[in-house]
Amino acid sequence: MKILLPILICFFSINIHAQNFGGGLILGLSTSQVSGDHLGGFNKAGLLVGGFIDLQLSKTLKGQMEMTFIQKGSNNPNMNENSYSDISLSYVGIPLLLKYQQSSTIAIEGGIETAFLISASDNDVYGKISANSTREFNTVDISIFIGMNYSINSKLILNSRISNSIIPIRDHASGATFKLNKGQYNSVLSFALHYII
């Protein structure tokens, strides 16, 4: 977590009212799954909250940096019927992205996110499973994403985004690897409102 302090200082020290800079707040919902956990579907709902700053690079192109708290993982809606545990993960994420303004109301985006794990647990029907009985999660999750923005008005933007880890969040239970499949990966579909300050 020590690495977050200088990033936080830089993030919030930028004057968002300077020429070509903007910024705002983020509030939304994440839905996620973890590949390789025997559970399918974006069944895990979580909180997505944070802030952003952006820089107008050209008439149609913006660079943007965000800092968010996001919940990821997987959910087993049939836990009483099978023995598969699900996963709860919380991260502080730093997405870096480019936004292309396709029209007055639509923008498309793509980028990379580095997320730092702040809490993790495997869960069964009785609650959290002891950390001594589970495999350890990696402390950093790196993912790539694409998304779309719809401008509701001059202050409010609806953002939808899909992302996938490019490095495993932890090894498979067996420790095996399969070519590009090196372990378990986060997949996230998120929906958020961006309020421009």
Functional labels for PLM-detected ranges:
Residues 21, 41-47, 88-92, 138-144, ...:
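Residues that define the transmembrane beta-barrel architecture of outer-membrane proteins
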Residues 55-59, 100-104, 152-154, 197:
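Outer-membrane beta-barrel strand-turn architecture
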Residues 21, 60-63, 106-108, 154-160:
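Repeated loop/turn-to-beta-strand initiation elements of outer-membrane beta-barrel proteins
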Residues 22, 150-157, 183-197:
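Outer-membrane beta-barrel "beta-signal"
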Residues 34-41, 71-90, 118-139, 168-184:
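Flexible, solvent-exposed loop segments that connect beta-strands
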Residues 29-33, 69-73, 114-118, 162-168, ...:
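Transmembrane beta-strands of outer-membrane beta-barrel pores
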Residues 1-26, 193, 197:
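Bacterial Sec-dependent N-terminal signal peptides
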Residues 25-27, 65, 96, 110, ...:
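Membrane-embedded beta-strand positions of outer-membrane beta-barrel proteins
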